[in-house]
């Protein structure tokens, strides 16, 4: 399984906080749930366009919007500190940029966990053909 994890990270392009975000998702669902979202719908994974396909995809859309609002740093490369307290993800970073990125990831992980029942395997590796509609505004 460790080899699969390493291969997946190489395929999608490892970024600074990707591992942290993956661990947050796994904390709100079952282990290795992150893999379900590597390429899901129109927004989960690299980039995004069109209309989110379901509530899970909308979580990724909102996450992308959150990253777009983080100014003065690169949210995909920022590493931050967080912990789990009584089942909750707690961002512990005081740096403005790092805290904002941590909060984006925390909210998205919670959202994906709350909407896991909307997950549709048919949206995994969805062709961009189905995401051609005009993108919503953040």
From Swiss-Prot:
The active site is at 63, 105. Residues 1-16 form the signal peptide. It is an enzyme of class 3 (hydrolase). Disulfide bonds join 42-131, 44-60, 59-111, 65-138, 66-104, 73-97, 91-102. CDD domains: PLA2c. One of its GO terms (biological process) is arachidonate secretion. Its EC number is 3.1.1.4. Keywords: Disulfide bond, Hydrolase, Lipid degradation, Lipid metabolism, Metal-binding, Secreted, Signal, Toxin. Expressed by the venom gland. The keyword Transmembrane helix does not apply. It catalyses: a 1,2-diacyl-sn-glycero-3-phosphocholine + H2O = a 1-acyl-sn-glycero-3-phosphocholine + a fatty acid + H(+). Its cofactor is Ca(2+). GO terms for cellular component: extracellular region. The keyword Zinc-finger does not apply. GO terms for molecular function: calcium ion binding; calcium-dependent phospholipase A2 activity; phospholipid binding; toxin activity. Belongs to the phospholipase A2 family. Group II subfamily. D49 sub-subfamily. PANTHER family: PHOSPHOLIPASE A2 FAMILY MEMBER (PTHR11716), PHOSPHOLIPASE A2, MEMBRANE ASSOCIATED (PTHR11716:SF9). This is Basic phospholipase A2 Drk-b1. It comes from Daboia russelii (Russel's viper). The lineage of its organism: Eukaryota, Metazoa, Chordata, Craniata, Vertebrata.
